UniProtKB/Swiss-Prot annotation:
Keywords annotated in UniProt: Chloroplast, Plastid, Ribonucleoprotein, Ribosomal protein
Gene3D superfamilies registered for this protein in UniProt: Glucose-6-phosphate isomerase like protein, domain 1, Helix hairpin bin
Subunit (UniProt): Component of the chloroplast small ribosomal subunit (SSU). Mature 70S chloroplast ribosomes of higher plants consist of a small (30S) and a large (50S) subunit. The 30S small subunit contains 1 molecule of ribosomal RNA (16S rRNA) and 24 different proteins. The 50S large subunit contains 3 rRNA molecules (23S, 5S and 4.5S rRNA) and 33 different proteins.
UniProt protein name: Small ribosomal subunit protein uS2c
Claim: Ribosomal protein is one of the keywords in the record: yes
Similarity section: Belongs to the universal ribosomal protein uS2 family.
Gene: rps2
Entry function: Component of the chloroplast ribosome (chloro-ribosome), a dedicated translation machinery responsible for the synthesis of chloroplast genome-encoded proteins, including proteins of the transcription and translation machinery and components of the photosynthetic apparatus.
HAMAP family referenced in this protein's UniProt entry, alphabetically: Ribosomal_uS2_B (MF_00291_B)
PANTHER family associated with the record: 30S RIBOSOMAL PROTEIN S2 PROKARYOTIC AND ORGANELLAR, SMALL RIBOSOMAL SUBUNIT PROTEIN US2M
Record-linked InterPro entries: Ribosomal_uS2 (IPR001865), Ribosomal_uS2_bac/mit/plastid (IPR005706), Ribosomal_uS2_CS (IPR018130), Ribosomal_uS2_flav_dom_sf (IPR023591)
Organism encoding this protein: Spinacia oleracea (Spinach)
GO molecular function, one term: structural constituent of ribosome
Pfam family, any one: Ribosomal_S2
Length: 236
């Protein structure tokens, strides 16, 4: 895999608060190699390590997207949800940003059935068939559509398991991470000082609570994915 330059700037990361970890009492000792200092009861993340692993992750997603691979971005907590949706839409990736439904990947046949149901209902709505139903029946179908849009809207075009999963908060999305590990799906994980860096294929040490930090990391990854897709289009 060729190493590329991704314009990862330490000053830019500091401005986004990427270096702020959790309180010193709330940490995972396995994160010790990624912590550079303590300040006012907070662990400070070593941004040199962040830059290194973010660059590796960008190389990985560029290489994968240049070969037509599919990505899933997962981040369901409020601070991450909007950034996840925006990043995924920009890079034409699948995403989950509301709630991870247990078995979404490991029980793919059930998820696929739900997606088929969702597509059928959307087609009926587009064709105007809901208007012909009795009001009560139409209301039931609309509630179903709303529920499916909330939880499956980001993966409505997914036809199989993703090739790489990007996870914004390891602890918050632990179920999703375990499913990826079970299925052998490579993962890129944004990890704060309370996480286990050994669980993901590439762990990026960074503040997973600040919107600016999350957005910066996703922006770099999305740029690499888009660059890879452009390469794939030019050289299919």
């Amino acid at each position: 895999m060729t190493r590329r330059y991704w314009n990862i700037n330490l000053e830019e990361m500091m401005e986004a608060g990427v270096h702020f970890g959790h309180g010193t009492r709330k940490w995972n000792p396995r994160m010790s190699p990624y912590i550079s200092a303590k300040c006012k009861g907070i662990h400070i993340i070593n941004l040199t390590r962040t830059a290194r692993f973010l660059s590796e992750a960008c190389d990985l997603v560029f290489d994968a997207s240049s070969r037509g691979k599919q990505f899933l971005i997962v981040g369901t907590k409020n601070k991450a949800a909007d950034s996840v949706a925006r990043a995924a839409i920009r890079a034409r990736c699948h995403y989950v940003n509301k709630k991870w439904l247990g078995g979404m990947l490991t029980n793919w046949s059930t998820t696929e059935t739900r997606l088929h149901k969702f597509r059928d209902l959307r087609m009926e709505q587009t064709a105007g068939r809901l208007a012909r139903l009795p009001k009560r029946d139409a209301a039931v179908v609309k509630r179903q559509l709303s529920h499916l849009q909330t939880y499956l809207g980001g993966i409505k075009y997914m036809t199989g398991l993703p090739d790489i999963v990007i996870i914004v908060d390891q602890q918050e999305e632990y179920t999703a991470l375990r499913e990826c590990i079970t299925l052998g799906i490579p993962t890129i994980c944004l990890i704060d000082t309370n996480c286990n860096p050994d669980l993901a294929d590439i762990s990026i040490p960074a503040n997973d609570d600040a919107i600016a930090s999350i957005r910066l990391i996703l922006t770099k990854l999305v740029f690499a994915i888009c660059e890879g897709r452009s390469s794939y289009i030019r050289n299919p």
